[in-house]
Design a protein with these regions (language model features):
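Extracellular parallel beta-helix/beta-solenoid repeat domains
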Residues: 1-486
Length: 486
């Protein structure tokens, strides 16, 4: 038996736990027990395995490490059957991973950027507050460690993700603890990483670690996730930290299946993480698995999230019926995000924000927020300085919020459409929610340009026309040809 250790923040009525690798419980088909000391596998098959190959991986290191290298291509290679991750990238430029399959790995497929040394045994952090005895993060190479646990408090950390790396046309599934860590860029200097994940199919990535290990964790500045399909994830599809990221043309469904108080796409708790764009995505079939827990949603802009853009998206069948009412786009105690041009189909009402504080007040009186937005020491990775010339020029509205109590409260809403009548759409059975020609004509007539102010997207007292959304451009491209060698 292992030594006792901390396994949760607290135990509640809807908490889940299970025992792993206990020989005495080896009773049913499909179960197995690993005797690590003697390197033996005990397995009760659930079908005839005559002629089958059974593999027991002992590799506990990352399979391939690429550090400070340039112009390298991995094409059509399967990475499988390891207790660690597939590829680790640190620094460098233009490392391309394409047409590869990642499966049956113990941690994740690809890690771009350094991890953090594991926290002391039995210690934890929660919402940016470290338990006594937990040190500041120490970067480590070729390992994940406790990077996720530190990010709420140290979101200005540059973990050396390099530049112009690309993950393309890959199939990622059956991971132990998430899919991809996509880092790059520097939040102190706002230098973009320009790293991307493009046209990848990612699913079933929480075999071992079921919360806060999303299909994609994106951090840093100026990275992109586009044309991906993400599904069957027990927590978030995408967890975001940083600035100026673009999340576009993705199809996301059947995620947060083992979580509550969560979103298919999640960001928050740092008022300096602005300039991110969520556009032209199709998010659907998001349901609350635990009725006694809090809600779930499509896009979650959590505590203090400001000045990002959510436009041109389709939301279908987003249902949250937990103890707290969540809407498809849900923000709490923040605001001032541009929400426009979205279509909601068979969803609960999507405008029910939880506005619990004033942004100006929090920036000056909440210690955690102060460290995020006004850390003048360049070497202090607690946060950035939004009063610096660099941030003032890039995000003038953010500086005004800090100095003048500018536009506290709600988001900017315009041209959003809510429909529960499926007769308006071309082919609902195949989830094609493009409008019929007749309905499109009616909508063009009805949605005449309106006068609105939206500082995030640069509209000041201008008329904003409704922008048509090309449903057929969303999701994987050339799906039948993209998986590479299997």
């Amino acid at each position: 038996m292992c030594d006792p250790h901390l396994f949760s923040f607290e135990v509640t009525g809807h908490s889940c736990w299970h025992i792993v690798n206990l020989f005495e419980e080896l009773t049913d088909e499909g179960e197995y027990y690993i005797d690590r000391e003697n390197k033996k596998l005990y397995f009760i098959p659930n079908k005839d395995i005559a002629g089958s190959e059974i593999r027991l991986s002992v590799l506990d290191k990352v399979m391939v490490s690429v550090e400070n290298a340039e112009n390298i291509v991995f094409d059509g290679i399967p990475f499988e059957n390891s207790r660690n991750s597939g590829i680790y990238i640190q620094g460098g430029e233009s490392v391309i991973i394409k047409n590869c399959t990642f499966r049956n790995l113990g941690i994740m497929a690809i890690q771009i950027g350094m991890g953090a040394e594991p926290q002391p045994h039995g210690k934890n952090t929660c919402h940016g507050e470290r338990a006594e005895g937990v040190p500041v993060p120490k970067p480590i190479s070729r390992e994940m460690g406790s990077w996720q646990e530190y990010l709420y408090e140290f979101a200005a950390w540059d973990n050396d993700g390099g530049h112009n790396h690309s993950i393309e046309n890959c199939h990622i599934y059956n991971m132990g603890a998430g899919g991809v860590l996509l880092s790059g860029g520097n939040r102190k200097t706002l230098q973009h990483g320009n790293n991307r994940i493009f046209n990848c199919h990612i699913h079933d990535v929480n075999r071992l670690d079921r919360t806060y290990k999303p299909a994609i964790h994106i951090m840093g500045v100026g990275n992109k996730i586009a044309h991906c399909e993400i599904h069957d994830v027990t927590c978030m599809a995408i967890n975001l930290h940083g600035n100026d990221h673009i999340i576009e043309y993705n199809r996301i469904h059947d995620v947060v299946t083992g979580s509550s108080d969560a979103g298919a796409i999640y960001m928050g708790r740092d008022m300096s993480e602005v300039g991110n764009v969520f556009r032209y995505n199709f998010i659907y079939h998001i349901h609350n698995p635990y009725k006694t827990g809090l809600g779930v949603c499509a896009i979650y802009l959590d505590d203090g999230c400001l000045y990002n853009s959510v436009y041109g998206n389709y939301f279908y069948d987003i249902v949250s019926d937990g103890q707290m009412f969540f809407t498809p786009i849900y923000w709490t105690q923040g605001g001032q995000t541009s929400i426009a041009n979205n279509i909601y189909i068979d969803c609960l009402p999507s405008t029910n924000p939880n506005i619990g504080h004033n942004s100006f007040d929090k920036m000056h009186n909440d210690e955690l927020i102060i460290r995020c937005v006004h850390t003048e020491d360049f070497d202090d990775i607690h946060g950035v300085d939004i009063t610096s010339d660099l941030y003032r020029e890039k995000y003038p509205y953010l500086y005004k919020t800090y100095t003048e109590d500018y536009a506290p409260g709600t988001c900017y809403w315009n041209n959003d459409v809510y429909i529960n009548q499926y007769t308006h759409f071309k082919d609902k059975e195949n989830l094609d929610f493009s409008f019929t020609d007749e309905q499109q004509k009616k909508r063009d007539e009805y949605l005449s340009p309106v006068r609105i102010t939206d500082v995030v997207r640069g509209y000041e007292k201008e008329r904003i026309p409704y922008e048509k959304i090309d449903f057929y451009s969303i999701g994987l491209l050339n799906k039948e040809k993209m998986y590479g060698k299997t």
